């Protein structure tokens, strides 16, 4: 990725910057270039960070965070845009409440029978996950969840559009009912399709044939579903559920938690 501004950015534009303390010098240079061209700049970054200190000026508005979490930064930016009339209404308190509910359902204190994140982690223990989200935000969540699965297991995990997953599902290794589950060297890892479902109508057309294809090729399907609240709340809950599952997967596989 590049931090360079597009050539067309000028005095009539608003530049939005979400950053942690990574690439501070490059991000600061980009902000300075936007200000030099006369653009207004809104920056979401940790309070007291080098970016926050160097971005001070009349042409910039800094929304400080207390964490480097991407979702928290996005919520602050969306709330700020909503307050100045440049975006839909966002209720961070409702998002926080929804995430609290997911944390309770997926809590370590919940048994496997009542904890969907633990159940998903067990299902993926010896599998190669494909992650699909049909809506724009569910697809975004699927990419982050797949990344978390890769880090947790050290194995491939792919997030892609339905059309791109077709060939992967068709080429998936068939399940052998006589395979030795304890044969670490001879066993072929099978594929599981993880569907992130936010109950948006725009994903129904792609979802049905994708699930039918998975069934024909003996690819198991696991669903993370959330249908309450607005689009942002649903996105946050799908993501949090997936990240809980990735954490339990890492614990179950004995992976290095500091990685």
Name the predicted role of every residue range:
Residues 1-104, 197-198, 208-213:
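Glycine-rich phosphate-binding loops that contact phosphosugars or nucleotide phosphates
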Residues 13-20, 174-183, 188-197:
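Short, well-ordered secondary-structure micro-motifs within conserved domains or adaptor modules
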Residues 23-29, 138-143, 203-204:
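Short glycine/serine/threonine-rich phosphate/pyrophosphate-binding segments
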Residues 83-186:
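Active-site phosphate/pyrophosphate-binding segments
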Residues 188-230:
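C-terminal hydrophobic structural anchor segments
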Residues 212-259:
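Charge-biased C-terminal accessory regions appended to nucleic-acid-, cytoskeletal NTPase
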